[in-house]
């Protein structure tokens, strides 16, 4: 089984990924693949360089470029695990790449929605090199994600978590969701 986790930046995707990992299931981050590719090209890990490499990859390999680069990692992990989690799918082209590469696997899409103001505050506090520090940067990043097609992936989700309450409430919802998905094995 492949579980695709999607949502806008700062929505709470990593909590779902970590819950699967705590239960022994591996994950592949498409964002990490872009960051690795940035370093391979001899570039410093800055917001601008990562964005440029992301765009270049899509120009060189198509809109599903990052998913194509992830397929072999996912294939290798599936040899040793009943579930592999993929974090950071941003377009239906990428979903299609995984469906095409793994026709025998049950592919489940989980989306997380969190109100924009909450996401902005989380991203500011997270402090990763590519996280926005101003509302304008945040909105620009959101529009970029939407242009990539993340809205289509969210719309096609098999499960939708709304993360607008307390941390404890969300963590309980995540555990319940992971229990439900694992019960389908």
Curated annotation (Swiss-Prot):
Molecular function per GO: ATP binding
Top-level taxon: Archaea
Residues annotated for ATP binding in this entry: 7-14
InterPro entries attached to this UniProt entry: NTP_hydrolase-rel, P-loop_NTPase
SUPFAM superfamilies named among the record's database cross-references: P-loop containing nucleoside triphosphate hydrolases
Entry keyword ATP-binding: yes
Keywords associated with the record: ATP-binding, Nucleotide-binding
Keyword ATP-binding: yes
PANTHER family according to UniProt: DEPHOSPHO-COA KINASE, UPF0200 PROTEIN MJ1399
Family classification: Belongs to the UPF0200 family.
HAMAP family with a match to the protein in the record: UPF0200
Record protein name field: UPF0200 protein TK1334
